[in-house]
Structures are given as structure tokens and as C-alpha cells.
Design a protein with these regions (language model features):
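Structural and coupling elements of P-loop NTPases
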Residues: 1-420
Length: 420
């Protein structure tokens, strides 16, 4: 898409262009959403400004996806012609449907010898409930169908709706920390406009800042005169602390503020907890600063100070899953040169004491005395497992080994079954 619209030159072409982190390139996954503005001259002769957000697929980063979707009107649902509809395809599609986005299905990799289009058609209709005629056939590698995708975006995805009052409303959907420029907020301008020199206010903190720079992503940060309604771009406003801006907050004009903030994002609940401690106890403050900077860039990561008899002072950290935990630990080592020790991951337990008091415990060392405990409850997950029919016995055995129970078995098509 970037190549076809001349957003990037031949010289800039590389695999995983929008995956800026070394970790993303090494693991072949997207961890952070990446915005980019492209200009497309359509068949009707008009030039359209399209704001593209490349989001992760893995369920551990679903919060990243949901924030990005809140800044969009539509989504391209990419299905692999050989692999078919995968679990994460479904999970992310439900997020898009909850936000009433226009969904354009794209069947990619049709050039592969193993591509099975009839099977993908059936899955799209049976599992995703989208008529297969709506799907665009494409091969990113061969450049097939790219024009069709761009035309479909122009035709099928509605243009941004804006408030008629012209007051500035800009949703903060992400932010990063720059050592030289401070906090950089990624925003979607819902209404009004913002330019350099303007005084803006954030609703959550009620703080006022002067805008130093605004711009768009092409994919690199590119300064512009202003951001208008419908634009996705960035605002730099002299913020020095990672805590100054909250993801989901609203920027408005200090002199003509809008009456209320935009609906933000639902608070995310960590699922997995682990202790992270510095190997050298003198690095405690440096580790704390590193975590604060990571948190500004990853709102799903939480931490609070704790101490251990064996490991000294460190932090109890919350993550969305095991991959999320692994990525955070690796980023601390690579980006901040931290030498860390991490404890075995655990979940939150609900404990009812004999006196009727209820408490949540995410660290086994904080459990009450055995004689004070009436009941301990652990999280239960309702899981839908899509699998090839021939593996049903093995998977059922695995579920039982993990203390699960199969409540329903449903045949999806000739080859696949869904267990609940």
C-alpha cells in the first residue's frame, strides 16, 4: 500500500517497514501499532488522504488493537489464503464490530501454491459471517489487488464525521517518550484543528501546554502546519514527564474548550503478574524510571514497588499475557540496559477470609494465614478452540490435563471443529 501510493521510495523499501523495534523484526510480529498517512489518487480523479494504522495480531496486544480501532472508521481484515481464518482474526474482528467499523475482508497470499480459496470462502461465510463476494483477492508480494484495496477503502469506508461546533477534540490513542523532545502524543483529531503555538488543555489532568510541533507519519514523523479534523498525527507540547499524558485523554483548545472529553478506553486489567528486581540493588531508581517510560508507551503494563526477603527491592508487574511479559522484560534489557531478575508468573486470586472479608492477592507471599482462609478462587476462562478434526482427541486430553472441561463440540466445516 505504501509503495503503490509512493509514500515510500524504492530506497526505503524493506520487510516489516512499520515495525520499528528490533524485537518486532526478530520475532516477525507487530507489538506496537504504527500510524502512517498516505495520499491516494482514486479512479474518480480526486486525491484522498488515508490514515492507516498497522496493528498487532497477537491476543496479548489486543489493547493496542482496540485503541487503534477507536481512532478509525474502517478496517482491512487480512486473511491468509493458505492458513484460512485464524483465532486472532476472529478476536480482532469482534473488536472492530463492537465499534461499528466498516470491515473490508482481504484474502492475501493468493499466489501461494498452497492457497485454498474455496476453503477460505467457506470460512469467511461460516465463521466470520461475511459474504465471500465482498473479499478482495490480493498478493502483497506480487502487487496483485492493491489498487482494488485502495479503491475499496475510498468507496466502502465512510469519511470521518466531525462535530459542527469546530471546537478542538483530539483523542490520545498512544504516546512515546523522546529523550530530546519529551512526550510525543499520537492523536486522532475528531473536530477542530491544532497548530504550533496554540495553548491546549488535557481533561484528565487539567494541565495547560503550549504546542511546540504537530505533524503526520509518512511513516517517519513529518512536521506540518496544522492537524485538521479527521487527521491522525502527533502533538509535541513540552511535556517532560511520562505521567503528564494519559492514553484515552482528550486535547482541547484552552481558550475555547469543548464541554466534555471524548469517551476514552476501558481500563485494562492485567492477567499475569510477576516480580521484576534489579540484579544490583543500586539500580532500583533507574529501573523505576525505565518502567515509567515503558508504561507511557504501553498502557497495558502496570507496576508497583514491592520488596522480597531474598531479592530486595523491586516491582510487582502486571501483564496481559506471557508474551507481553516476555516482551517487556526484553525491552528493559535492550532499551534501558537493565540487568534484571524476574519471578515465576502468577495470576490474581480472590480470597474469602473466615471473618467474611474478601481480598485479591497477586503474590502468594501475601496470602493470609491458612486458618484465616475460608475459600480461594482462581480466574476461569471461557475458551473457543478451533482445530482440525483429526486432533480433537489430543486437544480434549490437553484441556483435561489443564483442569478444563469441554462443554460443547461444533463442526465448522469438513475439516475443522470448534470446542468450547
Amino acid at each position: 500500500l505504501l509503495e503503490k501510493t509512493n509514500t515510500i521510495s524504492e530506497r526505503e523499501k524493506q520487510d516489516q517497514l512499520l515495525d520499528a523495534m528490533d524485537l518486532e523484526r526478530e520475532k516477525g510480529i507487530t507489538i506496537k501499532s504504527h500510524p502512517v498517512t498516505i495520499f491516494y489518487k482514486a479512479k474518480d480523479g480526486k486525491t484522498y488522504k488515508l490514515n492507516l494504522l498497522d496493528t498487532p495480531g497477537h491476543v496479548d496486544f489486543s489493547y493496542e488493537v482496540s485503541r487503534s480501532l477507536a481512532a478509525c472508521e474502517g478496517a482491512l481484515l487480512i486473511v491468509d489464503a493458505a492458513q484460512g481464518v485464524e483465532a486472532q482474526t476472529l478476536a480482532n474482528m469482534h473488536l472492530a464490530m463492537d465499534l461499528n467499523l466498516a470491515i473490508i475482508p482481504v484474502i492475501n497470499k493468493i499466489d501461494l501454491p498452497s492457497a485454498n480459496l474455496p476453503n477460505v470462502y467457506r470460512q469467511l461465510e461460516d465463521i466470520v459471517c461475511i459474504p465471500h463476494e465482498e473479499a478482495i483477492h490480493a498478493s502483497a508480494k506480487m502487487g496483485i489487488g492493491i489498487d482494488d484495496i485502495l479503491e475499496a477503502v475510498v468507496r466502502r469506508i465512510p469519511p470521518p464525521e466531525t462535530e459542527k461546533d469546530g471546537l478542538l477534540r483530539a483523542l490520545v490513542f498512544d504516546s512515546v517518550y523522546d529523550a530530546y523532545r519529551g512526550v510525543v502524543s499520537y492523536v486522532r483529531v475528531i473536530s477542530g484543528s491544532v497548530q504550533r503555538g496554540m495553548k491546549v488543555k488535557l481533561f484528565a489532568t487539567d494541565e495547560v501546554y503550549e504546542v511546540k510541533e504537530v505533524g503526520i507519519f509518512t511513516p517517519k514523523m513529518t512536521r506540518t502546519d496544522s492537524l485538521e479534523a479527521g487527521d491522525v498525527g502527533y502533538i509535541i507540547a513540552n511535556m517532560k514527564s511520562a505521567a503528564d499524558v494519559k492514553i484515552g485523554d482528550t486535547y482541547t483548545d484552552y481558550t475555547r474548550p469543548c464541554p466534555s472529553p471524548l469517551p476514552g478506553f476501558k481500563e485494562i486489567r492485567p492477567m499475569v503478574f510477576s516480580g521484576i528486581y534489579p540484579v544490583d540493588s543500586s539500580d532500583f531508581e533507574a529501573l523505576k524510571a525505565a518502567m515509567a517510560k515503558l508504561q507511557i508507551n504501553d498502557a497495558a503494563f502496570s507496576f508497583q514497588a514491592e520488596s522480597s526477603v531474598a531479592l530486595g527491592f523491586g516491582f510487582r508487574c502486571g501483564f496481559l499475557g506471557l508474551l507481553h511479559m516476555e516482551i517487556i522484560q526484553e525491552r528493559l534489557r535492550r532499551e534501558f540496559n537493565m540487568d534484571i531478575i524476574s519471578t515465576y508468573p502468577s495470576v490474581i486470586y480472590e480470597v474469602t477470609k473466615t471473618n467474611g472479608e474478601e481480598t485479591n492477592v497477586d503474590n502468594p507471599s501475601l496470602l493470609p494465614e491458612p486458618q484465616e482462609i475460608q475459600e480461594i478462587r482462581e480466574p476461569i476462562v471461557k475458551v473457543f478452540i478451533m482445530l482440525p478434526g483429526e486432533y480433537i482427541g489430543d486437544i480434549m486430553q490437553l484441556v483435561l490435563e489443564k483442569r478444563g472441561s469441554v462443554t460443547n463440540t461444533e463442526t465448522i466445516d469438513d475439516t475443522r471443529v470448534m470446542l468450547t
